[in-house]
């Protein structure tokens, strides 16, 4: 970034904002890069501002029992706020004085007042000087207030972020991500621009009092008629506002429903295509859209009348003020024109400025109170560690996640002790205690010595993660003692990847040790993965490790924990995403060898891990079921297998957690997070649902990204659980959009209660967030000294061979710390923003306007009609002026003022009636025409929005996956949320306002030009100057706005990243570093926003300067060319003053229109996406006719109509090559094999080898080459829809959309209830559905949060059975299941798909044993394709992965004694199946 010219700018340059000229010139000539943006002034840095406010807030906390945040803000900003308020008031006062001089100028034309005529020229000079003074006062004042608002926002942003990192986990349990984002965006954004209006809460009343005094002097009591009307008008507008809010609230629920379905569709677009559900989803969404648009039109009409009321109120104000006076004393033109000018100012003060100011204070104080409450939340407390101990000890530890239960626990226990003394009832305590809440851990005792390995196992929800959280201090014990040395390293069960390089993620701020680093890389099996990257371990990872597989993310997280030199290592199910072979190698080389001398606590349930552990702790429902060695476990607890049921590899996922609230860390951010709800909780929350989707969505966030969802940071209590749980293998950033898309656009959908402006939700970015905030600094003090900005030292390891693509800016200090400079790596930033900025021009093209206007044929006629009415209005106005100029006047004796009978100044009583009749008649006609003009325009523009939404939805659904893979999910969602909201809400009325203002200006200029043709000569160059200045400014401002909008992304993304890894951050003590990164993100945004505000003020000031010149010309032309006794000067000057404010408003509206039209450009970009080939046309035609066929009819000349295809399920694959995007690297190369009908084939390969990719290639979801045949029919000779219908799919990412059970099973409504129940019975789903009220009509929300992952997979099975598929594709169906539920699915597979071809991708060996053939994929190619016997006889990957016990299961005859126990375990599983059916929810 460049150094800001502001630092060296002169006072004059600062006053006129001339220092922004270089960036304006550069932006006009070329596209702006981030390197062109100026550095922020040091006073605006987040470090300085946050430190200042934090100091005052701490002072407030220390000095008062009831601290007020507003007091801290007052001490920081009050005097500057007051100073700019006084400037603003003085500027507003000049507006009230201007009409006085205007009246004197008109009065100077009175023939009897010759003395005044001589000073008219001086009065004109004074009037012009008032405009100059007003310009010099208002713009610095407005900019100063915007600047203060920006500083307040930055300081509070930082304060909130710092507080977030300190919040206790119990508080986090009650706060959703959506609430935090709303706190940062919706609330704090009010300060930036709203602060400039705050002073009008006292300025407007003073101004009204001054104006009424001046009007009273002119019109006496008549003055209050106009004021009364304005007050009534303000109340009327308030009433319209309430009505509009009612419609908006109703509409927000409908929007939420649509966006929920749309979000689910986008996130699961691959499943939608695999199931051939494109038309079904389109119909569902369009039906919701239709209902939404009815309310949209009502709200738009109310807003239209509200806006029109302001435009058309001017006539009534003047009319009501002047009429009583004119009827009594006649019309005095001087007083009329002066009153008109006063009323213009008065109308603005009463109907706009004061209501806006009141609303600003209301919103601001509300936001401050919310932030104040947040800042007083309970903070995380670190445990007091015993640094002398070497062991880890827990003694009688009991804990609750629910806040306050600890105190109740002690009280109940005390009462229990008192009662036991009297009645001896030992069980009384826990009978009382059950009323208080369930402890997540009860009476836990264990002791492990230094260097020992403790394996913690247990069933789902047993409290294993809570145990680790207790040791880390995240969960406070209600009773008992915990002792350990305090140096802890932690690996979360959900792999958390910090945006940065692989090396930075592993080192994570610890001093760099090459030998240790290489040892950890090797032990965690990362060497091979890293070697595949061109940049090796310096490759930049996206947010959440978007470019990595789940297994790679898990190994990096484990490596981070192992690299840190600690006394105690807490490993929470670190092997979740690893294949069997990799897991085995890492456990041996890393956990058992590399960490052999360290104390380790490992959450696991694998038998091999339990055997190697020094001690084993088995938890069951929060209690210690067993503690001891493995041999003791076998002797004392022979039934321990049943306690591990429902666990196995499922442990690392939160899908089935039922009891504890926070035990599964950041549940909503898990890659496979289902709703952890118990059956009792299900009844509390889910049985209240109705058929209306919106009933359970009162607190949803509409992502604008995002994402339309309320993501809880932790699992919420049953009454709070309104969030959405995702079954997603995709990283979070593919689903969660927390920041606005970088494209320009102001409107979004924040909360369900209101549609307003604010940030929209956005998704993953290609580059690291740290790219946005840091820049490499060469080693050496000399370079560092060149950086004038402040630096902040944080701990981070240095690296050798730094390149300019490095994320961190670093300098090795003696304390192995890091100096992060304020410099930004522009190249990385440019690359990071490239996606958002490309292919959207800085200024909306004329082609976009033309395409938008011609989209609906009625729109052109409406615009022509508007022009015709405008011409009629101008003609009527000229007629009125002609009548005024030619009104006959009475004799001198009959005139009101006997000394004057000139029509230029006085019109008599008799003529006044005549004039007013004409004026009122014409004005009423114009009002009626005006309303008639606007309504059709607004109505038609909403219809255009409807068409654009339909076209875009259709294009997205029909786009190939290769195209969709290049887009960000949040970016797509923003089109349907933010951009459609702009098209619905803002664009129609903004276009109406612009057209209205433009016509007013043109009409005023036309009238003035008719009265004084010389003025027209002055008008032409002024209008030309306006157009050129607008074009010059717009080119730069839109780019700055685009950069500013993109600059918001790192702020919210960094917040989410920090929250996702909050426990890891605390365990590693990295809060200060992440605070620094957050300040970097804030400073980046501030640089763009401050420059945008400055250039905007430059533009506004130039507009005023041009007008001042124009007004000077008009004033002197009028004074010098108006002859004796003519009164047209009053009309000319009054209209000229009106032109000033209206033309500025019109120019600003044109800029708003251009900004909002960028949303149209983005929508057109999506509409123009390519479509998949082979799309049947019959269904499309049926849809266009408003009817959606229940059965899709596809003609295929290669298949006889009498045949049922596919009949057997035989597959032949020849030279299959697959790529994710056109021109990308091949993921699979030259795959060839064949599958016999009814055969079961297992896919084997290491993590990331391409197993899931092969299944996607079968469905033609990727760019593929080669050939596949099913029963002799090639995929090239059949339509895409029919090809996909041949497959049944159970994907990793189970798709349950918001809708009934029936709709989820049969979206095309092809099957009767009897057929659906029959299939549900076949797959074991009937008992699940019957437990819900409404059964098939029960509405599933939040991704089916009331269902376990196993039940969701059963629904996928049911869909496949209903589709009559002959080939079934299963992608790791057991990855998130306990063995019991998986047994149910295996049984369903055997029964429902006995004669089908099954292709299974699975990590669990037991699940693969039923396959006849195995396809081993290695290095993107087929390595082996053989039966299981051949693979076991060779040194294959399968043989390495399978354990001896699994081989015994395969060949029981080789060792019958070892196999005897198998039937017992199998029978145990069978016994529990029915129990699972009843309790699995």
Swiss-Prot record:
Catalytic activity: ATP + H2O + closed Cl(-) channel = ADP + phosphate + open Cl(-) channel; chloride(in) = chloride(out); hydrogencarbonate(in) = hydrogencarbonate(out); ATP + H2O = ADP + phosphate + H(+)
InterPro entries linked: AAA+_ATPase, ABC1_TM_dom, ABC1_TM_sf, ABC_transporter-like_ATP-bd, ABC_transporter-like_CS, ABC_transporter_C-like, CFTR/ABCC7, CFTR1_ATP-bd_dom1
Lipid-conjugated positions (S-palmitoyl cysteine): 524, 1396
Top-level taxon in the UniProt lineage: Eukaryota
Extracellular-side positions: 99-122, 217-222, 320-339, 880-918, 1012-1013, 1117-1130
Span list, region Disordered R region: 654-831
Extent of Acidic residues compositional bias: 1471-1481
The entry's keywords: ATP-binding, Cell membrane, Chloride, Chloride channel, Endoplasmic reticulum, Endosome, Glycoprotein, Ion channel, Ion transport, Isomerase, Isopeptide bond, Lipoprotein, Membrane, Nucleotide-binding, Nucleus, Palmitate, Phosphoprotein, Repeat, Transmembrane, Transmembrane helix, Transport, Ubl conjugation
Binding positions (ATP 2): 1220, 1245-1252
Phosphothreonine modified-residue sites: 717
Cross-link (Glycyl lysine isopeptide (Lys-Gly) (interchain with G-Cter in ubiquitin)): 688
Record family assignment: Belongs to the ABC transporter superfamily. ABCC family. CFTR transporter (TC 3.A.1.202) subfamily.
Assembly information from the UniProt record: Monomer; does not require oligomerization for channel activity. May form oligomers in the membrane. Interacts with SLC26A3, SLC26A6 and NHERF1. Interacts with SHANK2. Interacts with MYO6. Interacts (via C-terminus) with GOPC (via PDZ domain); this promotes CFTR internalization and thereby decreases channel activity. Interacts with SLC4A7 through NHERF1. Found in a complex with MYO5B and RAB11A. Interacts with ANO1. Interacts with SLC26A8. Interacts with AHCYL1; the interaction increases CFTR activity. Interacts with CSE1L.
Domains as described in the record: Binds and hydrolyzes ATP via the two cytoplasmic ABC transporter nucleotide-binding domains. The two ATP-binding domains interact with each other, forming a head-to-tail dimer. Normal ATPase activity requires interaction between the two domains. The first ABC transporter nucleotide-binding domain has no ATPase activity by itself.
Protein name: Cystic fibrosis transmembrane conductance regulator
Gene name of the encoded protein: CFTR
